[in-house]
Amino acid sequence: MRAIILAAGRGMRLKQAEEDQLPKCLLRFGGMTLLERHLRLLRSAGVEDVVLALGWRHELVSAELDRIDWQPRPGIVLNPRYELGSVLTVHTVAEAMTRGGDVLLMDADVLYHDRIMAALTAGSKPTNRVLLDRDFEAGDEPVKLCVRAGVPIELRKQLAPDLKYDAIGESVGFFRFDEPGARRLAAIVSDYVASDRAHLPHEEAVRDFFREGSHAVEVADVTGSAWIEIDFPNDVSRAAHEVLPQLRPL
């Protein structure tokens, strides 16, 4: 199993002071960067093959890897046009996506309980899997995951008013793909780039993968497990004061 961590973006909505600007994966909680937390949680799940998709201030991420002396050292793939969007970032890691075996595709800017990692990586059988949190705040920001008859049918911030579903929640931003699934997603992403849609979020390509219906996808319910995606200044405070106290020491 291989983990691909998407950490190329600048995170403009976080509004960091210019002298303090860091890639979001280098934000610290409990004295540990999000990057180190990802690596520790992946190792605890038996995942040592890690690829980092980097862009903005990538040298700071490399310096953090030097500081913690993480071995085996994660591979690094650079997206020099990171400002375009995450579809292009996923396209830059196409080789890692299609190298074989199950692939975990993970946003870097998430602080989360180890139960979420366990749900993502559970089982030795190859599978496609998405994580659902039914306890989410309504609004335009969460990426909603809609499920009907156990099958994911929608993955978007904005939903059609007449959409019929059995369950709805927020997508945690972590996905698992088996080898055929990863190859198909890489092909969809390549089509996006070739058709001038590289500026779109990669969830749009994942949505297409789900809606094709040609690959079975499991939905793992992680409701009740603490996590937060860090996009805005208030998210940093919530991560430190609401989520971090619920996490087990790493």
Regions found by a protein language model. Name each.
Residues 1-3, 167-250:
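Conserved alpha/beta core of the MobA/IspD/sugar-nucleotide pyrophosphorylase nucleotidyltransferase superfamily
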Residues 25, 73-75, 216-218:
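Conserved beta-strand segments of alpha/beta enzyme cores
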Residues 13, 60-63, 115, 184, ...:
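Phosphate- and divalent-cation-binding pockets in alpha/beta enzyme and binding domains
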